[in-house]
Amino acid sequence: LPLTAVAEALDHAITVDPNWTGTTITSSQNNLHHDISTTHINGSVAANKFTKFQVGEKHLVDMHLPTNTNHLVNFVDNKISVNGTVNALKGSKVGGNLYFVSPKGMIVGKTGVINAGSLTAVITTDDAYKKYSELSDKKLPLGLGQKEEEALATLQKMQQGEVPLNPAGVITVNGSINAGNRITLAASQIHLESGAKLSNLETDFKDLVHIKEGQNVVTQSSVSDAIVTREADDGSGDILLLARSDSSATGSIAGSVTKQKVEAKVKVAKGAFVKSRGNVNGSSMAGNGVYDIEKTLRPSGYEQLSAEEKAKKDREIGHFVSDGKHKLLDVSSEIRIDGVITAAKDLDVNSVAENRLVKSSTTMADLSTGLTLEILGTATPFNEAVYYADLKTSSLISIGNEASLSADQNLSLDSVADTKLEAGTSTSLFNLFNTELTQKVPSVAAIVALADSSSTVNVAGSLKAGKDLTITSADDLTVEASATAATKESKAVQTSILVAKLKGTSDINVQSSALLDIVKDAGKVEISSNQNSSVKTESSVVVQDGSYGGLAFNYTELDTHSNVLLNTGFTNEALEASVTAKNVTEDLTIKADNAVGASGISKLL
């Protein structure tokens, strides 16, 4: 075979898990056309499991939904690759809800095409994948539930992206995804490269389901009627691009001075198109801790709140459960759009970076005093307690100068950076090695707390809204840090040192090249930047009678700003228009306490 033929042959590899004997692949047309069917059925849900799913160029795969089923779930152990055409067929029509679930990622190449009634692709964690795909005694996917309603509930969560996602998982699209209904892509990073096309406007697939070279059909599908099967479920016309990552894969990095990174990213490159007959939601979320899938952070009565109240409460309680361990962490959430996105309803672009280190200490042993930051120190001959935390948090939405975002109804850009650092260190309350020698060894409690939190929205391209246009950026910075040197029955010098360098910024930059296109008197325009900070730091020493003395030192530096730069106007008059920038310091408390002497330095910029 010539090298090109060998490469093409290697590129195509679809292998069924040997335990899934109900999945059948039948090939024809010189081994370029492949029909896939399954007998693994749970009510309206059918499933396949593959060790490999690589569709080569010029290869066409027709995936058949069994009679009376609406959902076809495909579990793939390795990275999914589509360089040919994949059709989901319900009867003789393109239709049904097609799912791809893998822990390793997915790529749709430049020649890749997926046609379905709806498509959901999720890149899960290894543990979640094993749970979802494992076979039960009934030869059904255990994670999809043994009852149909349980399976449907799990699939709904997949469509919403409310499943554990692999922090290293990536979905890349260079080709086309065509659907008549919902499209969901969920991973830690979503890349729509130049030439990518996502559309759920399709009703006629006759020019999409076959592989052609010019006007000639190279590989023909089994489709006899290419009209898509429409579904009437709520939100069926929505497109969700969800990138989410957490610190579950980074480890606690104890003893390390190397900062690790948690990154979520959505990219829509120049030359990429997203078109929806419903809503479009581009969402990026990155956080310190584990994403709260089970919503354990939500208080009782949450479901009775209004939508606006729920959003406010979610902002307050956060989306990630902190374990108090990730002290050196860079959390980054980013959405970059240089292509075209159009929505027949609402278009929402949301970026959230959440870096919360809560109740973190040197020893993680809290005193039963009711005080948040008092903790036990180390019980060693050398009574020292040193704590170092460095948190960087950044949320960015960037709309490039050739980007075009259009919504027939509301259009919103919302960026949020949320940094919360609760940290304390203390020498041991009782020195278990209290000897005449150790009485002369100084006790030292030292804490260094660094936090850099920023939220930014940059707009250089076109924004068109049929109703409301909203551009918001918010940065929340909350720090409580304490260093305490207090050892009973010790004459040793007690020293407490606290150094905190803190920065919080919120910026909106609308450049002169930007077009803010609104319909006259149809809606409101809001451009709002908010920076909120609350800082409490305390360095304290408690010395005993007859001690050699003590020193408490506190250096706290806080630098915050909030800016809106608007270098263009609106194309028409709005019902209401507001442009605001707020910088609010809710609390700034800096203390250095010592019964013998104290030294405190503060710097506020």
Give the label of every model feature segment.
Residues L3-L605:
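Low-complexity, glycine- and small/polar-enriched segments
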